[in-house]
Amino acid sequence: ECLVGSEMCIRDSTYTANALVNSILSEFAERASRYKAIVEYSIVIGRSLNMEDIDLCRMLTNILENAVEGCQKVSEEQRIIRLNLHSKGNFLFIKCENSCNEDNLRITNGKYKSSKKNSDKHGYGLKIINGIAEKYNGILNVQVRGGFFAVTTTLCLDENND
C-alpha cells in the first residue's frame, strides 16, 4: 500500500514483482502527488500475467489517467485514488475508485463522455478499457456514487483469448 500526497514522494517504489505494472503504478503515484491526491494501492499479482503487455499497459494507464484527471475537479482535501489489482487463477480483477465532481460528469445515451474542451477528440479511455475487457472475455462496470467514480473489470486470462 502506498500513501502519496506530500512533498516526500518515493520514486521507483516497489508495489509488485511485475516490472511493467510497477513502472505504471510508480508513474501515476508521482503524477497524482503533483495534484496532492492520496493514492492507495492494493496489489496482489504474480511476476507475470497471461495478458499481452500492451493490453495491460493500455488498461492501467487509461484507468489511472482518468482517475488523476477526475481528482483534479475536486478540492485538494478530497482527492483520493484507490486501485485494487488482484489475480487469482486465470482471472485478473481491477477496481479503481477516484473522487470526482459528479456535476462535471456528462452522460449521453448511457455512456460517459469527456468533459474536456474539444470532447470529440477525447473520451477514448473508457472505449479502450471496454475493448480490452471484451478481448479477455471480461466485464466492465462503471459507477458513480457518493462522490466517487469507480471502474471495475474482471478479465479471463486463459490461452483462448484472441
PLM features: residue spans?
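Glycine-rich ATP-binding loops of the HATPase_c
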Residues: 137-147
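Glycine-rich/acidic phosphate-handling loop/turn and adjacent ATP-lid/helix
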Residues: 90-123, 156
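Short beta-to-alpha transition helix within the HATPase_c
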Residues: 17-35
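Short beta-strand/loop element within the Bergerat-fold HATPase_c
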Residues: 78-90
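Conserved ATP-binding N-box helix of the HATPase_c
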Residues: 53-76
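Conserved short strand/loop->alpha-helix "switch" segment adjacent to the catalytic nucleotide/phosphoryl-transfer site
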Residues: 13, 17, 39-59, 117
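Single conserved hydrophobic/aromatic residue that forms the stacking wall/gate
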Residues: 1-5, 9-10
